[in-house]
A protein has these predicted regions:
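N-terminal secretory targeting and juxtamembrane "stalk" segments of secreted and cell-surface proteins
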Residues: 195-203, 214-216, 241, 353-354
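Blade-loop segments of beta-propeller domains
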Residues: 233-250
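Primary recognition of N-terminal secretory signal peptides and signal-anchoring hydrophobic helices
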Residues: 2-15, 20-199, 226-230, 251, ...
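An acidic-aromatic
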Residues: 216-237
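Short, conserved, GDST-rich strand-edge loop motifs in beta-rich repeat architectures
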Residues: 155-160, 212-221
Protein backbone atom coordinates (compact mmCIF):
# COMPACT_ATOMS: atom_id res chain seq x y z
CA UNK A 1 0.00 0.00 0.00
CA UNK A 2 1.54 3.37 -1.02
CA UNK A 3 2.10 6.21 1.42
CA UNK A 4 -1.04 8.22 2.11
CA UNK A 5 1.00 11.40 2.40
CA UNK A 6 2.01 13.85 -0.26
CA UNK A 7 5.69 14.75 -0.70
CA UNK A 8 7.31 17.95 -1.95
CA UNK A 9 10.67 17.74 -3.71
CA UNK A 10 12.18 21.22 -3.90
CA UNK A 11 14.48 20.19 -6.75
CA UNK A 12 11.81 18.72 -8.97
CA UNK A 13 8.37 17.94 -7.58
CA UNK A 14 5.91 19.02 -4.97
CA UNK A 15 4.11 15.90 -3.84
CA UNK A 16 1.82 16.64 -0.95
CA UNK A 17 -0.94 16.40 1.71
CA UNK A 18 -0.36 18.40 4.98
CA UNK A 19 1.95 18.34 8.07
CA UNK A 20 4.31 21.09 9.51
CA UNK A 21 7.31 22.00 11.82
CA UNK A 22 9.43 25.14 12.18
CA UNK A 23 12.25 23.65 10.09
CA UNK A 24 13.92 26.12 7.69
CA UNK A 25 13.74 25.16 4.02
CA UNK A 26 17.45 25.55 3.27
CA UNK A 27 19.96 23.25 1.60
CA UNK A 28 23.42 23.28 0.10
CA UNK A 29 22.22 24.18 -3.41
CA UNK A 30 19.99 27.07 -2.35
CA UNK A 31 21.55 30.08 -0.64
CA UNK A 32 19.46 31.48 2.18
CA UNK A 33 19.16 34.92 0.57
CA UNK A 34 18.31 33.57 -2.88
CA UNK A 35 14.97 33.47 -4.65
CA UNK A 36 14.52 30.31 -6.72
CA UNK A 37 11.65 29.23 -8.99
CA UNK A 38 10.91 25.49 -9.16
CA UNK A 39 8.38 23.78 -11.42
CA UNK A 40 6.45 21.36 -9.22
CA UNK A 41 3.63 18.85 -9.11
CA UNK A 42 1.20 17.47 -6.55
CA UNK A 43 0.75 13.80 -5.63
CA UNK A 44 -2.01 12.61 -3.33
CA UNK A 45 -1.73 8.91 -2.52
CA UNK A 46 -1.59 7.35 -6.01
CA UNK A 47 -2.71 10.48 -7.91
CA UNK A 48 -0.24 12.96 -9.39
CA UNK A 49 -0.86 16.33 -11.02
CA UNK A 50 1.50 19.04 -12.19
CA UNK A 51 1.18 22.48 -10.60
CA UNK A 52 0.46 25.11 -13.22
CA UNK A 53 2.66 27.70 -11.49
CA UNK A 54 6.18 27.19 -10.10
CA UNK A 55 6.87 27.29 -6.38
CA UNK A 56 9.18 30.01 -5.02
CA UNK A 57 11.99 29.45 -2.51
CA UNK A 58 12.79 32.83 -0.97
CA UNK A 59 15.30 33.12 1.89
CA UNK A 60 14.90 29.41 2.49
CA UNK A 61 11.10 29.62 2.69
CA UNK A 62 8.70 27.97 0.25
CA UNK A 63 5.90 30.13 -1.17
CA UNK A 64 2.94 28.91 -3.20
CA UNK A 65 0.04 30.69 -4.92
CA UNK A 66 -2.90 31.35 -2.59
CA UNK A 67 -5.16 28.90 -4.39
CA UNK A 68 -2.64 26.07 -4.23
CA UNK A 69 -2.12 26.50 -0.49
CA UNK A 70 -5.84 26.79 0.24
CA UNK A 71 -6.44 23.68 -1.86
CA UNK A 72 -3.74 21.67 -0.07
CA UNK A 73 -4.87 22.78 3.40
CA UNK A 74 -8.65 22.69 2.79
CA UNK A 75 -9.07 26.41 3.46
CA UNK A 76 -11.54 28.97 2.14
CA UNK A 77 -10.13 32.20 0.65
CA UNK A 78 -11.31 35.82 0.73
CA UNK A 79 -9.29 38.39 -1.24
CA UNK A 80 -9.69 42.13 -0.49
CA UNK A 81 -8.55 44.07 -3.54
CA UNK A 82 -8.70 47.43 -1.76
CA UNK A 83 -6.38 46.44 1.12
CA UNK A 84 -4.43 43.85 -0.92
CA UNK A 85 -5.03 41.33 1.84
CA UNK A 86 -6.09 37.69 1.87
CA UNK A 87 -7.98 35.94 4.66
CA UNK A 88 -7.95 32.15 4.92
CA UNK A 89 -10.68 30.34 6.85
CA UNK A 90 -10.44 26.78 8.11
CA UNK A 91 -11.53 24.61 11.03
CA UNK A 92 -11.43 26.86 14.11
CA UNK A 93 -8.90 29.10 12.36
CA UNK A 94 -8.64 32.50 10.62
CA UNK A 95 -5.40 33.72 8.99
CA UNK A 96 -4.92 37.17 7.44
CA UNK A 97 -1.93 38.25 5.32
CA UNK A 98 -1.22 41.41 3.31
CA UNK A 99 0.74 41.69 0.07
CA UNK A 100 4.28 42.94 0.73
CA UNK A 101 3.88 42.98 4.52
CA UNK A 102 5.61 40.79 7.11
CA UNK A 103 2.74 41.47 9.53
CA UNK A 104 0.06 38.78 9.61
CA UNK A 105 -2.78 37.86 11.96
CA UNK A 106 -3.78 34.44 13.24
CA UNK A 107 -7.14 34.47 15.03
CA UNK A 108 -6.80 38.31 15.28
CA UNK A 109 -3.38 38.02 16.97
CA UNK A 110 -0.41 39.77 15.35
CA UNK A 111 2.40 37.58 13.97
CA UNK A 112 5.64 38.52 12.15
CA UNK A 113 6.53 36.62 8.96
CA UNK A 114 10.02 35.64 7.78
CA UNK A 115 9.10 36.54 4.19
CA UNK A 116 6.11 38.62 3.01
CA UNK A 117 3.42 37.58 0.52
CA UNK A 118 4.48 38.66 -2.97
CA UNK A 119 3.12 39.10 -6.47
CA UNK A 120 4.52 36.96 -9.28
CA UNK A 121 2.96 37.04 -12.76
CA UNK A 122 -0.39 38.30 -11.41
CA UNK A 123 -0.47 35.56 -8.75
CA UNK A 124 -0.22 36.20 -5.00
CA UNK A 125 2.29 33.87 -3.35
CA UNK A 126 2.19 33.26 0.40
CA UNK A 127 4.54 31.31 2.73
CA UNK A 128 3.56 27.66 2.95
CA UNK A 129 5.22 26.92 6.29
CA UNK A 130 3.56 29.82 8.10
CA UNK A 131 0.05 28.97 6.90
CA UNK A 132 0.41 25.24 7.57
CA UNK A 133 1.85 25.71 11.06
CA UNK A 134 -0.98 28.16 11.82
CA UNK A 135 -3.49 25.39 11.22
CA UNK A 136 -1.40 23.01 13.35
CA UNK A 137 0.01 20.98 10.51
CA UNK A 138 3.59 19.73 10.75
CA UNK A 139 5.90 19.74 7.76
CA UNK A 140 9.01 17.57 7.91
CA UNK A 141 12.08 18.29 5.77
CA UNK A 142 14.41 15.55 4.51
CA UNK A 143 17.71 17.18 3.49
CA UNK A 144 19.08 14.12 1.71
CA UNK A 145 15.96 13.50 -0.37
CA UNK A 146 15.04 17.20 -0.57
CA UNK A 147 11.45 16.32 0.25
CA UNK A 148 8.76 17.81 2.46
CA UNK A 149 6.06 15.46 3.76
CA UNK A 150 2.58 16.89 4.30
CA UNK A 151 -0.20 14.43 5.34
CA UNK A 152 -3.82 15.38 4.66
CA UNK A 153 -6.04 16.11 7.67
CA UNK A 154 -9.39 17.36 6.33
CA UNK A 155 -11.66 16.82 3.35
CA UNK A 156 -13.82 19.75 2.24
CA UNK A 157 -17.10 20.26 0.37
CA UNK A 158 -18.81 23.55 -0.55
CA UNK A 159 -22.18 24.57 -1.98
CA UNK A 160 -23.93 27.97 -2.04
CA UNK A 161 -21.48 29.62 0.38
CA UNK A 162 -21.83 26.74 2.86
CA UNK A 163 -18.67 24.77 3.59
CA UNK A 164 -18.29 21.45 5.39
CA UNK A 165 -15.09 19.79 6.57
CA UNK A 166 -14.59 16.19 7.69
CA UNK A 167 -11.58 15.33 9.84
CA UNK A 168 -10.37 12.14 8.20
CA UNK A 169 -9.00 10.43 11.30
CA UNK A 170 -12.05 10.99 13.53
CA UNK A 171 -15.06 11.67 11.30
CA UNK A 172 -15.68 15.02 13.04
CA UNK A 173 -17.91 17.24 10.90
CA UNK A 174 -17.49 21.03 10.78
CA UNK A 175 -19.56 23.75 9.10
CA UNK A 176 -19.08 27.40 8.11
CA UNK A 177 -21.33 29.82 6.24
CA UNK A 178 -19.61 32.33 3.98
CA UNK A 179 -16.38 33.82 5.28
CA UNK A 180 -16.36 32.27 8.73
CA UNK A 181 -14.26 29.72 10.59
CA UNK A 182 -15.49 26.13 10.66
CA UNK A 183 -17.10 24.93 13.88
CA UNK A 184 -18.01 21.38 14.86
CA UNK A 185 -21.63 20.28 14.35
CA UNK A 186 -21.34 16.51 14.77
CA UNK A 187 -19.69 13.39 13.39
CA UNK A 188 -19.93 10.96 10.51
CA UNK A 189 -19.47 7.31 11.43
CA UNK A 190 -16.83 6.42 8.85
CA UNK A 191 -13.19 7.40 9.19
CA UNK A 192 -11.69 8.25 5.81
CA UNK A 193 -8.10 7.79 4.62
CA UNK A 194 -7.22 9.97 1.64
CA UNK A 195 -10.42 11.80 0.64
CA UNK A 196 -9.71 15.38 -0.45
CA UNK A 197 -13.18 16.67 -1.21
CA UNK A 198 -16.79 15.51 -1.22
CA UNK A 199 -20.11 16.55 -2.72
CA UNK A 200 -22.51 18.93 -0.99
CA UNK A 201 -26.03 19.57 -2.34
CA UNK A 202 -28.42 22.25 -1.08
CA UNK A 203 -31.75 20.37 -1.25
CA UNK A 204 -33.90 22.90 0.67
CA UNK A 205 -33.53 26.12 2.67
CA UNK A 206 -30.87 25.42 5.30
CA UNK A 207 -30.73 21.72 4.37
CA UNK A 208 -27.68 20.05 2.82
CA UNK A 209 -27.03 16.50 1.65
CA UNK A 210 -23.40 15.36 1.88
CA UNK A 211 -22.01 12.47 -0.19
CA UNK A 212 -18.57 11.05 0.56
CA UNK A 213 -16.58 8.53 -1.45
CA UNK A 214 -12.94 7.45 -1.62
CA UNK A 215 -10.81 4.71 -3.13
CA UNK A 216 -7.39 3.90 -1.72
CA UNK A 217 -4.81 1.14 -1.50
CA UNK A 218 -2.38 -0.18 -4.08
CA UNK A 219 -5.05 -0.88 -6.71
CA UNK A 220 -7.68 1.49 -5.37
CA UNK A 221 -9.76 -1.48 -4.25
CA UNK A 222 -10.34 -0.33 -0.66
CA UNK A 223 -13.42 1.89 -0.58
CA UNK A 224 -15.26 4.09 1.89
CA UNK A 225 -18.59 5.72 1.16
CA UNK A 226 -21.08 7.68 3.21
CA UNK A 227 -23.94 10.18 3.32
CA UNK A 228 -25.17 12.80 5.79
CA UNK A 229 -28.22 15.07 5.97
CA UNK A 230 -27.67 18.41 7.74
CA UNK A 231 -30.35 21.00 8.52
CA UNK A 232 -29.63 24.36 10.15
CA UNK A 233 -26.32 23.15 11.51
CA UNK A 234 -27.66 19.89 12.93
CA UNK A 235 -26.89 16.40 11.61
CA UNK A 236 -30.32 14.80 11.12
CA UNK A 237 -29.04 11.44 9.90
CA UNK A 238 -25.94 9.82 8.45
CA UNK A 239 -24.68 6.42 7.38
CA UNK A 240 -21.67 4.85 5.72
CA UNK A 241 -19.89 1.62 4.89
CA UNK A 242 -16.52 0.25 3.82
CA UNK A 243 -15.91 -2.48 1.27
CA UNK A 244 -13.31 -3.82 -1.13
CA UNK A 245 -13.47 -4.47 -4.85
CA UNK A 246 -12.59 -3.34 -8.36
CA UNK A 247 -16.11 -2.26 -9.23
CA UNK A 248 -17.40 1.31 -8.83
CA UNK A 249 -19.96 2.40 -6.27
CA UNK A 250 -23.14 2.72 -8.35
CA UNK A 251 -25.46 3.73 -5.52
CA UNK A 252 -27.97 6.46 -6.38
CA UNK A 253 -28.27 9.39 -3.99
CA UNK A 254 -31.73 10.81 -4.55
CA UNK A 255 -35.13 9.51 -5.57
CA UNK A 256 -37.55 12.30 -6.40
CA UNK A 257 -37.52 14.56 -3.31
CA UNK A 258 -35.99 11.97 -0.99
CA UNK A 259 -32.33 11.27 -0.19
CA UNK A 260 -30.72 7.89 0.48
CA UNK A 261 -28.94 6.74 3.62
CA UNK A 262 -27.36 3.30 3.32
CA UNK A 263 -24.74 1.09 4.94
CA UNK A 264 -24.85 -1.35 2.04
CA UNK A 265 -27.12 -3.75 3.93
CA UNK A 266 -29.96 -1.45 4.92
CA UNK A 267 -31.37 1.49 2.98
CA UNK A 268 -33.72 4.27 3.99
CA UNK A 269 -35.12 7.24 2.09
CA UNK A 270 -35.57 10.53 3.96
CA UNK A 271 -37.38 13.75 3.12
CA UNK A 272 -35.78 17.18 3.54
CA UNK A 273 -36.73 17.22 7.23
CA UNK A 274 -35.04 13.90 7.97
CA UNK A 275 -38.30 11.92 8.18
CA UNK A 276 -37.88 8.32 6.99
CA UNK A 277 -40.29 7.70 4.11
CA UNK A 278 -39.23 4.14 3.32
CA UNK A 279 -36.79 1.64 4.80
CA UNK A 280 -35.49 -1.69 3.50
CA UNK A 281 -33.34 -4.43 5.03
CA UNK A 282 -31.50 -5.49 1.90
CA UNK A 283 -29.77 -8.56 3.32
CA UNK A 284 -33.08 -9.84 4.71
CA UNK A 285 -34.76 -9.28 1.34
CA UNK A 286 -32.09 -11.28 -0.46
CA UNK A 287 -31.33 -13.68 2.43
CA UNK A 288 -27.63 -13.13 1.74
CA UNK A 289 -25.13 -11.16 3.81
CA UNK A 290 -23.71 -9.05 0.99
CA UNK A 291 -23.19 -5.39 0.10
CA UNK A 292 -25.94 -4.05 -2.16
CA UNK A 293 -25.93 -0.88 -4.26
CA UNK A 294 -29.31 0.83 -4.76
CA UNK A 295 -29.31 1.92 -8.43
CA UNK A 296 -32.97 2.93 -8.86
CA UNK A 297 -35.99 3.37 -6.61
CA UNK A 298 -39.62 4.42 -6.75
CA UNK A 299 -42.80 3.35 -4.96
CA UNK A 300 -43.25 0.35 -7.26
CA UNK A 301 -39.80 -1.23 -7.50
CA UNK A 302 -36.14 -1.01 -6.61
CA UNK A 303 -33.07 -1.95 -8.66
CA UNK A 304 -30.17 -3.38 -6.65
CA UNK A 305 -26.71 -4.55 -7.62
CA UNK A 306 -25.10 -7.25 -5.52
CA UNK A 307 -21.61 -5.80 -5.30
CA UNK A 308 -19.50 -8.96 -5.03
CA UNK A 309 -21.13 -10.72 -7.98
CA UNK A 310 -22.31 -7.59 -9.86
CA UNK A 311 -25.63 -9.36 -10.47
CA UNK A 312 -28.59 -7.02 -11.03
CA UNK A 313 -31.72 -7.50 -8.90
CA UNK A 314 -35.32 -6.29 -9.22
CA UNK A 315 -37.33 -5.90 -6.02
CA UNK A 316 -41.10 -5.52 -6.34
CA UNK A 317 -42.12 -3.18 -3.52
CA UNK A 318 -45.78 -4.26 -3.59
CA UNK A 319 -45.22 -8.02 -3.63
CA UNK A 320 -42.05 -7.73 -1.50
CA UNK A 321 -40.26 -10.20 -3.77
CA UNK A 322 -36.83 -9.99 -5.39
CA UNK A 323 -35.33 -11.77 -8.42
CA UNK A 324 -31.96 -11.85 -10.16
CA UNK A 325 -32.46 -10.27 -13.57
CA UNK A 326 -30.16 -12.65 -15.45
CA UNK A 327 -32.33 -15.57 -14.29
CA UNK A 328 -35.53 -13.96 -15.60
CA UNK A 329 -34.70 -12.42 -18.97
CA UNK A 330 -34.16 -14.37 -22.19
CA UNK A 331 -30.37 -14.35 -22.23
CA UNK A 332 -28.62 -17.09 -24.22
CA UNK A 333 -27.62 -19.92 -21.88
CA UNK A 334 -23.92 -19.35 -22.59
CA UNK A 335 -24.24 -15.72 -21.48
CA UNK A 336 -26.06 -16.76 -18.30
CA UNK A 337 -23.28 -19.24 -17.57
CA UNK A 338 -20.64 -16.53 -18.07
CA UNK A 339 -22.44 -14.22 -15.64
CA UNK A 340 -22.83 -16.99 -13.07
CA UNK A 341 -19.16 -17.99 -13.26
CA UNK A 342 -17.96 -14.38 -13.03
CA UNK A 343 -20.22 -13.82 -10.03
CA UNK A 344 -18.73 -16.81 -8.19
CA UNK A 345 -15.15 -15.61 -8.57
CA UNK A 346 -14.68 -13.02 -5.80
CA UNK A 347 -11.23 -12.08 -7.18
CA UNK A 348 -12.40 -11.70 -10.75
CA UNK A 349 -12.12 -8.21 -12.19
CA UNK A 350 -15.32 -8.43 -14.19
CA UNK A 351 -15.41 -6.56 -17.49
CA UNK A 352 -17.72 -3.60 -16.91
CA UNK A 353 -18.98 -3.87 -20.48
CA UNK A 354 -20.52 -7.25 -19.72
CA UNK A 355 -22.97 -6.61 -16.90
CA UNK A 356 -26.72 -6.11 -17.11
CA UNK A 357 -27.84 -2.47 -17.00
CA UNK A 358 -31.35 -1.23 -16.15
CA UNK A 359 -32.67 1.08 -18.88
CA UNK A 360 -36.30 2.10 -18.22
CA UNK A 361 -39.82 1.00 -17.37
CA UNK A 362 -42.91 1.76 -19.48
CA UNK A 363 -46.38 0.49 -18.53
CA UNK A 364 -44.89 -2.04 -16.15
CA UNK A 365 -42.45 -3.45 -18.71
CA UNK A 366 -38.83 -3.07 -17.67
CA UNK A 367 -36.04 -2.97 -20.24
CA UNK A 368 -32.40 -3.92 -19.68
CA UNK A 369 -29.29 -3.74 -21.82
CA UNK A 370 -26.50 -6.30 -21.98
CA UNK A 371 -23.46 -6.59 -24.25
CA UNK A 372 -22.99 -10.24 -25.17
CA UNK A 373 -19.49 -11.60 -24.58
CA UNK A 374 -19.72 -13.79 -27.66
CA UNK A 375 -20.07 -10.97 -30.21
CA UNK A 376 -19.97 -7.69 -28.20
CA UNK A 377 -23.41 -6.75 -29.52
CA UNK A 378 -25.61 -4.77 -27.12
CA UNK A 379 -29.07 -6.31 -26.92
CA UNK A 380 -32.21 -5.15 -25.14
CA UNK A 381 -34.18 -7.51 -22.90
CA UNK A 382 -37.53 -7.03 -21.18
CA UNK A 383 -39.11 -8.14 -17.94
CA UNK A 384 -42.70 -7.61 -16.82
CA UNK A 385 -42.68 -6.28 -13.27
CA UNK A 386 -45.75 -8.41 -12.52
CA UNK A 387 -43.54 -11.50 -12.96
CA UNK A 388 -41.61 -10.50 -9.84
CA UNK A 389 -43.92 -12.05 -7.25
Amino acid sequence: MPSLSKKISVTAILCGSIFFSATEFTNEAVAKNAKVYVQAGVESADQYSQLKDPIIIDQGRILLPIRDISDQLSLNVQWNQKTKSVTLYGVNKEIKLTLGSITAYVDKKKVTLDVPPQMEKSKIYIPLQFVASSVKQKVTWDRSLKEITIPRTYAKGTENQMTYWIKLSTGELYQAKGNQIGTKIGNVSNKFKTMKDFQVENIAAGTYYLRMNENYGMSGTSRNTGQALVKNGKVLDEDSFSFMGYYPDTTLHKSHANVLMTNGKKARFLDKNGVVKAEYHLTDMMQKDEIYMVEHYNQRFMILREYASQHLIVYNVQSEQAVYVHEMISLPESEKDDLEQAGLDRNNEMERDHIIIFDRIIDGIMTFQYKNKSDNVVNTYTLDLSQVR
